[in-house]
Design a protein with these regions (language model features):
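Noncatalytic, solvent-exposed loop/strand surfaces
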Residues: 1-218
Length: 218
């Protein structure tokens, strides 16, 4: 329910605790907060949808003090934030319930935004970044591949597929230009990252074909 804690790893003693809903106006999603915290230098990043701004909140690892906020969405999603080093420089990728954002680390205005309103706000899996491409995939509205350019503000939809590639909770896996994704209708699927071309599907040989199939791909 929006409580952030830090504990001593040797003794289990509580070092600090923050109520992010009460103190930072974080927005509780339908199924509660589940985005994993992301460590960054001396800070830890939380995707908690603070209002009116602060999709991502940075706290001091040492004492829990708020260091900065960045990003604007109407609530919090479930996807952990992703730190990347793009051609234009470092940026923070946040997939919220209504948009995908490239954000400045340390606060400020978004470098870029791509609208993507997700049914029930279920932006769940952490985006992946390879070959200058950000990839996200949702259950109802499919997959988006966003190509980043030479400058921090350069971002455009490279391709999208709302019918054939629809993931949910299973993290996509990338290897040598190919992505592997657990699709809701056809099971484990392999496709080209740059084009979205489907190479093969296993038709649920590894997972149940009923609603919400799930598996961890490694």
């Amino acid at each position: 329910r929006g409580h952030a804690f830090a504990f001593n790893s040797q003794t289990g003693e509580k070092i600090w605790m923050r109520n992010l809903v009460a103190e930072e106006n974080a927005t509780v999603p339908i199924w509660g907060f589940s985005s994993s915290p992301e460590p960054h230098a001396s800070e830890v990043l939380f995707h908690v949808g603070c209002q009116p701004t602060g999709s991502v909140l940075a706290l001091s690892q040492a004492n829990g003090e708020t260091k900065w906020k960045v990003g604007r969405d109407e609530g919090a999603g479930y996807a952990p934030p992703l730190l990347i080093e793009s051609k234009g420089g470092p940026q923070l990728i946040c997939w919220g319930p209504n948009r995908i954002m490239g954000l400045p680390i340390g606060g400020g205005q978004a470098y870029w935004e791509v609208p993507y309103e997700v049914k029930y706000g279920v932006s769940i899996t952490k985006p992946i970044y390879h070959e200058d491409i950000i990839l996200v995939s949702g259950y109802w509205h499919g997959t988006r591949a966003i190509l980043l350019g030479e400058k921090l503000g350069d971002a455009k939809i490279l391709w999208s597929d709302e019918i054939n590639l629809r993931g949910l909770m299973s993290q996509a896996l990338y290897r040598k230009g190919i992505c592997f994704l657990l699709d809701r209708s056809s099971g484990l699927s392999a496709f080209e990252l740059k084009s979205g071309k489907i190479l093969w599907r296993d038709q649920h040989q590894l997972t149940p074909s009923e609603r919400n199939p799930q598996a961890s791909i490694v």
